[in-house]
Amino acid sequence: MNIDTREITLEPADNARLLSLCGPFDDNIKQLERRLGIEINRRDNHFKLTGRPICVTAAADILRSLYVDTAPMRGQIQDIEPEQIHLAIKEARVLEQSAESVPEYGKAVNIKTKRGVIKPRTPNQAQYIANILDHDITFGVGPAGTGKTYLAVAAAVDALERQEIRRILLTRPAVEAGEKLGFLPGDLSQKVDPYLRPLYDALFEMLGFEKVEKLIERNVIEVAPLAYMRGRTLNDAFIILDESQNTTIEQMKMFLTRIGFNSKAVITGDVTQIDLPRNTKSGLRHAIEVLADVEEISFNFFHSEDVVRHPVVARIVNAYEAWEEAEQKRKAALAAERKREEQEQK
């Protein structure tokens, strides 16, 4: 195995920024060493990296990039969290495995938040954003933690900031696992509001609480249950339907036909987390089958490698996917066996 050694110097030398980069007790450096299988020795702002060439190159790029992220904002040095190390490593590994680098959607959506600039982390995420830009209707289908909803909200905020649209509308069906809305206190909007919290959280992170509140008061941003969409035509709007796996076929059709002139719609969902009553087909599953060949509609499918949460989440997703695949094979085998027995009895 080829071993490479590279030395880098991070400028300007700043002990406070270096401390933020390395983390308490050098935890961030240790995570880089453990995850990339390399050795890192540091003396002040000089780093010596030893390991496989591709991993050394990735580590050097990560250190330089994260050191830039420590630059003071409003006089305060920015801390580097373990999650940022994980995301940076994940991004580097994607670039190693792909023949070409991730498309630079960061130039198209360049939104500064408390957590930095929002940009795609995987090729699937980059393609998803590109499709949102190029299509009137975009579907994002995949497990939790793949950035489907977050990136859609980022694209909506960017379109609003660029004045390409006049309003953002966020919605989701009023269905949740194990809970009946009729038994919850309050009117429909009060009952559904907690289920829209992920959408609120993304908006607050990107725009700040006060600005979001003002935009909601002016109806520039509307967060509402799917039931409120009936009978409306939405022009000059960016519309996001979250948790769409819990729509019925009729609800999905109703939503898609609300889209007016100069509007975009993004529909996100996870077909493995359907909470509809038994024997009720998901509107998302049906749309994937019916609309696959319709122009101006894009379908994007995410997988465990697109998960950008804690590393264990990707492993959990893989485990469930493996179980579901085995269960489908088992059911198919049972059905085939029953059919064979019926034929023999005849």
UniProtKB/Swiss-Prot annotation:
Domain of life: Bacteria
The keyword Isomerase appears for this protein: no
Annotated Pfam families: PhoH (PF02562)
Compartments where located: Cytoplasm
SUPFAM superfamilies: P-loop containing nucleoside triphosphate hydrolases
GO CC field: cytosol
Residues reported to bind ATP: G142, P143, A144, G145, T146, G147, K148, T149
Primary location recorded for the protein, binned into one broad class: cytoplasm
Similarity remark: Belongs to the PhoH family.
Protein name: PhoH-like protein
